[in-house]
Amino acid sequence: FAVLYRTNSQSRAIEDALRKKNIDYKIYGGISFYQRKEIKDLLSYLRMLINPNDEEALKRIINYPARGIGATTIDKLTIAANHYKKSIFDVIKNLDKIDLKINSGTKTKLQNFLNMILRFQIDMKKLNAFEVADLVIKQTKLVKDLEKDGTPEAVSKVENVQELLNGIKDFITDKIEEGEDASLTAFLEEVALATDLDADKKDDKLRVSLMSIHQSKGLEYPYVYVVGLEENLFLRQ
Protein backbone atom coordinates (compact mmCIF):
# COMPACT_ATOMS: atom_id res chain seq x y z
CA PHE A 1 0.00 0.00 0.00
CA ALA A 2 1.10 3.56 -0.69
CA VAL A 3 -0.37 6.88 0.41
CA LEU A 4 0.60 9.91 -1.67
CA TYR A 5 0.28 13.56 -0.67
CA ARG A 6 1.15 16.92 -2.21
CA THR A 7 3.10 18.49 0.66
CA ASN A 8 5.18 16.90 3.39
CA SER A 9 3.17 18.63 6.11
CA GLN A 10 0.19 16.43 5.17
CA SER A 11 1.99 13.38 6.51
CA ARG A 12 1.33 14.39 10.14
CA ALA A 13 -2.38 13.53 10.13
CA ILE A 14 -1.76 10.31 8.19
CA GLU A 15 1.03 9.21 10.53
CA ASP A 16 -1.12 9.91 13.58
CA ALA A 17 -4.08 7.99 12.15
CA LEU A 18 -2.00 4.95 11.20
CA ARG A 19 -0.29 4.96 14.59
CA LYS A 20 -3.62 5.00 16.43
CA LYS A 21 -4.69 1.93 14.43
CA ASN A 22 -1.34 0.19 15.08
CA ILE A 23 -0.61 0.12 11.35
CA ASP A 24 3.10 0.19 10.57
CA TYR A 25 4.30 2.71 8.00
CA LYS A 26 7.46 4.16 6.55
CA ILE A 27 8.27 7.56 5.08
CA TYR A 28 9.70 6.94 1.63
CA GLY A 29 12.54 9.27 0.76
CA GLY A 30 12.03 11.39 3.86
CA ILE A 31 11.75 11.43 7.63
CA SER A 32 8.86 11.13 10.06
CA PHE A 33 6.96 14.34 10.79
CA TYR A 34 8.09 14.53 14.40
CA GLN A 35 11.73 14.00 13.41
CA ARG A 36 11.91 17.11 11.21
CA LYS A 37 14.21 19.83 12.54
CA GLU A 38 11.65 22.62 12.73
CA ILE A 39 9.25 20.33 14.59
CA LYS A 40 11.91 19.16 17.04
CA ASP A 41 12.86 22.80 17.65
CA LEU A 42 9.32 23.83 18.59
CA LEU A 43 8.79 20.67 20.64
CA SER A 44 12.01 21.43 22.52
CA TYR A 45 10.58 24.79 23.58
CA LEU A 46 7.44 23.07 24.82
CA ARG A 47 9.47 20.41 26.63
CA MET A 48 11.46 23.15 28.37
CA LEU A 49 8.26 24.68 29.74
CA ILE A 50 7.24 21.37 31.29
CA ASN A 51 10.72 20.42 32.47
CA PRO A 52 13.31 23.24 32.42
CA ASN A 53 15.94 20.69 33.44
CA ASP A 54 15.59 18.91 30.08
CA GLU A 55 19.12 19.65 28.91
CA GLU A 56 18.73 18.12 25.46
CA ALA A 57 15.86 20.51 24.80
CA LEU A 58 17.67 23.47 26.37
CA LYS A 59 20.81 23.04 24.28
CA ARG A 60 18.68 22.82 21.15
CA ILE A 61 16.85 26.10 21.71
CA ILE A 62 19.12 28.28 23.85
CA ASN A 63 20.49 29.87 20.68
CA TYR A 64 17.63 29.19 18.28
CA PRO A 65 16.50 31.43 16.79
CA ALA A 66 19.95 32.99 17.11
CA ARG A 67 20.28 35.17 20.20
CA GLY A 68 24.07 35.44 20.46
CA ILE A 69 24.70 32.57 22.89
CA GLY A 70 27.54 30.64 21.32
CA ALA A 71 29.07 27.19 21.76
CA THR A 72 31.77 28.48 24.12
CA THR A 73 29.16 29.87 26.51
CA ILE A 74 27.16 26.64 26.37
CA ASP A 75 30.34 24.68 27.18
CA LYS A 76 30.96 26.91 30.21
CA LEU A 77 27.39 26.38 31.36
CA THR A 78 27.77 22.61 31.00
CA ILE A 79 31.05 22.55 32.93
CA ALA A 80 29.56 24.65 35.72
CA ALA A 81 26.46 22.44 35.86
CA ASN A 82 28.62 19.34 36.25
CA HIS A 83 30.84 21.02 38.84
CA TYR A 84 27.99 22.27 41.03
CA LYS A 85 25.81 19.23 40.33
CA LYS A 86 23.03 21.43 39.01
CA SER A 87 21.09 21.57 35.77
CA ILE A 88 22.17 24.09 33.14
CA PHE A 89 18.91 25.94 33.73
CA ASP A 90 19.71 26.24 37.44
CA VAL A 91 23.14 27.60 36.57
CA ILE A 92 21.54 30.27 34.39
CA LYS A 93 19.17 31.13 37.26
CA ASN A 94 22.16 31.64 39.55
CA LEU A 95 24.50 33.65 37.33
CA ASP A 96 24.95 36.20 40.11
CA LYS A 97 26.42 33.47 42.34
CA ILE A 98 28.40 31.46 39.76
CA ASP A 99 31.33 33.02 37.95
CA LEU A 100 31.30 31.69 34.39
CA LYS A 101 33.89 34.20 33.27
CA ILE A 102 31.60 35.62 30.62
CA ASN A 103 31.16 39.26 29.66
CA SER A 104 28.19 41.37 30.71
CA GLY A 105 26.66 41.22 27.23
CA THR A 106 26.53 37.42 27.25
CA LYS A 107 25.19 37.44 30.79
CA THR A 108 22.37 39.73 29.67
CA LYS A 109 21.53 37.39 26.79
CA LEU A 110 21.35 34.44 29.17
CA GLN A 111 19.15 36.44 31.53
CA ASN A 112 16.83 37.34 28.65
CA PHE A 113 16.57 33.66 27.70
CA LEU A 114 15.78 32.77 31.31
CA ASN A 115 13.12 35.47 31.58
CA MET A 116 11.50 34.30 28.35
CA ILE A 117 11.16 30.72 29.60
CA LEU A 118 9.85 31.87 32.98
CA ARG A 119 7.25 34.10 31.28
CA PHE A 120 6.11 31.19 29.13
CA GLN A 121 5.74 29.03 32.23
CA ILE A 122 3.54 31.67 33.85
CA ASP A 123 1.42 32.04 30.70
CA MET A 124 1.12 28.26 30.44
CA LYS A 125 -0.94 28.17 33.63
CA LYS A 126 -3.82 30.01 31.96
CA LEU A 127 -3.53 28.75 28.37
CA ASN A 128 -4.27 25.41 26.72
CA ALA A 129 -1.62 23.44 24.82
CA PHE A 130 -2.46 25.00 21.45
CA GLU A 131 -2.37 28.54 22.83
CA VAL A 132 0.98 27.90 24.51
CA ALA A 133 2.54 26.58 21.30
CA ASP A 134 1.11 29.48 19.30
CA LEU A 135 2.48 31.97 21.84
CA VAL A 136 5.94 30.38 21.73
CA ILE A 137 6.02 30.60 17.92
CA LYS A 138 5.05 34.27 17.96
CA GLN A 139 7.26 35.38 20.85
CA THR A 140 10.38 33.56 19.62
CA LYS A 141 9.75 34.59 15.99
CA LEU A 142 10.45 30.99 15.02
CA VAL A 143 8.37 31.15 11.84
CA LYS A 144 9.95 34.45 10.80
CA ASP A 145 13.35 32.82 11.14
CA LEU A 146 12.22 30.00 8.84
CA GLU A 147 10.71 32.40 6.32
CA LYS A 148 13.81 34.54 5.87
CA ASP A 149 15.41 32.07 3.43
CA GLY A 150 12.54 32.53 0.98
CA THR A 151 13.08 29.07 -0.50
CA PRO A 152 10.56 26.29 -1.26
CA GLU A 153 12.17 24.34 1.59
CA ALA A 154 11.49 27.25 3.93
CA VAL A 155 7.84 27.31 2.86
CA SER A 156 7.60 23.58 3.56
CA LYS A 157 9.09 24.05 7.03
CA VAL A 158 6.59 26.79 7.86
CA GLU A 159 3.77 24.50 6.69
CA ASN A 160 5.11 21.79 8.99
CA VAL A 161 5.06 24.13 11.98
CA GLN A 162 1.48 25.12 11.17
CA GLU A 163 0.58 21.46 10.85
CA LEU A 164 2.00 20.79 14.31
CA LEU A 165 -0.35 23.47 15.64
CA ASN A 166 -3.20 21.70 13.82
CA GLY A 167 -2.11 18.46 15.44
CA ILE A 168 -2.17 20.00 18.91
CA LYS A 169 -5.64 21.42 18.23
CA ASP A 170 -6.87 17.99 17.07
CA PHE A 171 -5.31 16.39 20.16
CA ILE A 172 -7.16 18.77 22.48
CA THR A 173 -10.49 18.19 20.70
CA ASP A 174 -10.13 14.40 20.77
CA LYS A 175 -9.06 14.23 24.40
CA ILE A 176 -11.85 16.50 25.60
CA GLU A 177 -14.42 14.39 23.71
CA GLU A 178 -12.95 11.25 25.29
CA GLY A 179 -12.83 12.83 28.76
CA GLU A 180 -9.07 12.42 28.93
CA ASP A 181 -6.10 14.64 29.77
CA ALA A 182 -5.70 17.33 27.09
CA SER A 183 -2.76 19.11 28.71
CA LEU A 184 0.52 20.06 27.07
CA THR A 185 2.23 17.40 29.17
CA ALA A 186 -0.12 14.73 27.81
CA PHE A 187 0.50 15.88 24.24
CA LEU A 188 4.28 15.73 24.67
CA GLU A 189 4.00 12.26 26.19
CA GLU A 190 2.04 11.10 23.14
CA VAL A 191 4.64 12.61 20.80
CA ALA A 192 7.44 10.94 22.77
CA LEU A 193 5.68 7.59 22.40
CA ALA A 194 5.23 8.16 18.67
CA THR A 195 8.92 9.00 18.33
CA ASP A 196 9.91 5.85 20.21
CA LEU A 197 7.70 3.74 17.95
CA ASP A 198 9.32 5.28 14.87
CA ALA A 199 12.75 4.39 16.22
CA ASP A 200 11.72 0.77 16.84
CA LYS A 201 10.55 0.11 13.29
CA LYS A 202 12.54 -2.32 11.19
CA ASP A 203 13.18 -1.82 7.50
CA ASP A 204 12.31 -5.39 6.52
CA LYS A 205 8.79 -5.28 7.93
CA LEU A 206 5.78 -4.90 5.63
CA ARG A 207 4.49 -1.38 6.07
CA VAL A 208 2.34 1.25 4.38
CA SER A 209 4.53 3.61 2.36
CA LEU A 210 3.95 7.35 2.77
CA MET A 211 5.45 9.73 0.25
CA SER A 212 4.96 12.93 -1.69
CA ILE A 213 3.78 12.85 -5.30
CA HIS A 214 7.23 13.96 -6.40
CA GLN A 215 8.93 11.10 -4.56
CA SER A 216 6.57 8.51 -6.06
CA LYS A 217 7.75 8.96 -9.64
CA GLY A 218 8.84 5.67 -11.15
CA LEU A 219 7.43 3.56 -8.32
CA GLU A 220 4.58 1.06 -8.50
CA TYR A 221 2.26 -0.28 -5.79
CA PRO A 222 -0.76 -2.63 -6.01
CA TYR A 223 -2.88 -0.16 -4.02
CA VAL A 224 -2.38 3.60 -4.04
CA TYR A 225 -4.32 6.23 -2.11
CA VAL A 226 -3.99 9.92 -2.97
CA VAL A 227 -5.03 12.40 -0.27
CA GLY A 228 -5.70 16.12 -0.31
CA LEU A 229 -7.21 16.36 -3.77
CA GLU A 230 -8.27 19.94 -3.13
CA GLU A 231 -8.26 23.03 -5.29
CA ASN A 232 -5.23 25.26 -4.67
CA LEU A 233 -3.51 22.44 -2.78
CA PHE A 234 -2.99 19.59 -5.20
CA LEU A 235 -0.73 20.58 -8.08
CA ARG A 236 -1.77 23.77 -9.87
CA GLN A 237 -5.01 25.12 -11.26
PLM feature segments, named:
Residues 5, 104, 228:
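Conserved residues at beta->alpha junctions
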Residues 75-80, 93:
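C-terminal helical "lid" of AAA+/P-loop NTPase domains
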Residues 65, 95-215, 236-237:
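Accessory C-terminal helicase-associated subdomains
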Residues 1-59, 148-159, 166, 182-183, ...:
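Conserved motor-region signature of P-loop NTPase helicases/translocases
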